Each structure stands twice: as C-alpha cells, then as structure tokens.
C-alpha cells in the first residue's frame, strides 16, 4: 500500500481545518457541501458527515476544508478526518457518485442572467479581479468565492468552504473585496453576500 501524508493547516475560521492530501482533489471548479444532504453526491463528503461532528465540507483544487460543528474538539475529530481522507486517497475511490463528477454545486454563473447586458464590460472587469486577485487568497484560507451578480452598483458574492461561516468573512467582503473592487471599478458602490 502506498505511503501518503496529509498536511493540515488552520484557517481564519476557527471551526474549519484545511487538509492537503498532496494531490489534485478537483480537476476543475470547487464543490461546497454545506450539509449532509448535499454530501450525498460524494462518498467522501458523506463519510465525513457520518462522523457526526462535521457541519461542512468543501473541495478545492488541492485541498479539502472540513468545518466542525459547534463545541466540537478538533483534537478528537482531526485524527478521524485524516483516517478517512487517507483511506479515500490510498484506495482511489471516486470523489463523486455517478455523472456528477466535478464542478461547483451551484454554477458560478448562477444569478448572472439578472446582469444588465449594458453592464457587460463592468461585469467582465469585476470577474477578472475576483478570479486573479480574490479567489487565490480565499482558496489559500480554505474556501472560495462565487460571483452571483451585479445590479445597480452592488456586487453579489457567495463565500464557500472555510469562508462561509468565518467570523471575519463580513470584514473580508467589506474591507478587502469591496475596497479592491471600488478602487479598480468605480461603478462598484457596494459588495454584499448573496
């Protein structure tokens, strides 16, 4: 049986740990499992929720973020999560059931049909900044950010993974992302969680 080591990193969200298996998790996109019902699409996510103390699972390109439920002691949960991840990656089990092979649970462009075609150039600038400046930083913290729309000067975004329940996520949206977008795209007046 091959030897494997899973690295663990803390995230700004104290309830979430980021697990790095040292190999590709998602070939494209990301996947958020905010509850056990959503996790039914993935045997690994379902097994993590079956531990009982897990309240969220998120797959990034080369990491898996696991969020513990309220009051859960990571010193007890972490070895169980690592054991499940090792078993999954060493045995080569599929990440998803059936045709649902990859990508995010909610398409990244969900809500874009509401974008005004007259704002196409502005929306393209916003998406470019999110893709090149924001997503890499958010992924580094064990999460992702998804564009949901631009209406009347307001950019709507969804935080996923470690970022979804993080106490500092609203500060990240307002002070970090909103400041960046307003600086480069003057038409942006505000950023809100969608």
Segments from the language model and where they lie:
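Domain-level signature for proteins that mediate thiol-based redox and metal-cofactor handling
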Residues: 1-194
């Amino acid at each position: 049986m091959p030897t494997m080591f899973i690295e663990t990193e803390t995230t700004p969200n104290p309830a979430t740990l980021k697990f790095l298996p040292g190999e590709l998790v998602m070939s494209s996109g990301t996947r958020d499992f905010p509850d056990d019902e959503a996790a039914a699409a993935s045997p690994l996510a379902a097994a993590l929720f079956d531990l009982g103390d897990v309240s969220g699972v998120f797959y990034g390109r080369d990491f898996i973020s696991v969020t513990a439920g309220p009051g859960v002691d990571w010193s007890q949960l972490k070895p169980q999560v690592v054991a499940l991840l090792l078993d999954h990656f060493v045995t080569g089990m599929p990440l998803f059931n059936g045709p649902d092979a990859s990508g995010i649970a909610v398409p990244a462009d969900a809500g874009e049909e509401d974008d005004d075609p007259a704002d196409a150039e502005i929306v393209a600038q916003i998406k470019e900044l999110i893709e090149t400046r924001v997503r890499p930083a958010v992924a580094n913290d064990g999460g992702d950010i998804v564009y949901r729309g631009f209406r009347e000067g307001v950019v709507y975004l969804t935080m996923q993974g470690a970022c979804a329940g993080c106490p500092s996520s609203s500060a990240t949206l307002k002070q970090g992302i909103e400041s960046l977008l307003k600086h480069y795209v003057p038409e942006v007046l505000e950023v809100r969680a969608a």
